[in-house]
Design a protein with these regions (language model features):
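Short S/T/G/P-rich N-terminal loop/turn motif that feeds into the first structured element of a domain
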Residues: 1-49, 56-69, 76-96
Length: 96
């Protein structure tokens, strides 16, 4: 399994709108081949938002890269947010 972690900077006053826009984008991401799930992490005080999406394998995460970037940009455009970083990782095991 592989994970893509994206970190965003959002105006804290626009966080609720950003979450709504990312929820909509997430529905489209979920339709991409090899998608296995995802999570959103948020710090309402400082405007940090992180998305973590899980993918079946390296090929799936690579295939999704362009579309995922388009969806991120579309979601952030509505709230003047910025993508601070996007990094992919291998997931060797699940805790627990």
């Amino acid at each position: 399994m592989h994970a893509r972690v994206a970190r965003y900077g959002i105006d804290p006053d626009k966080m609720v709108d950003a979450l709504e826009a990312l929820r909509d984008a997430g529905r489209e991401v979920a339709d991409l081949e090899g998608y296995k799930g995802g999570h959103v992490l948020v710090d309402y005080d400082d405007g940090t938002l992180i998305t973590l999406t899980l993918w079946e394998n390296r090929a799936a995460i690579d295939r999704s890269e362009v579309r995922a970037a388009q969806l991120r940009q579309r979601a952030l455009r509505s709230v003047d947010g910025e993508v601070q970083s996007v990094t992919c990782y291998e997931v060797p095991f699940e805790l627990g």
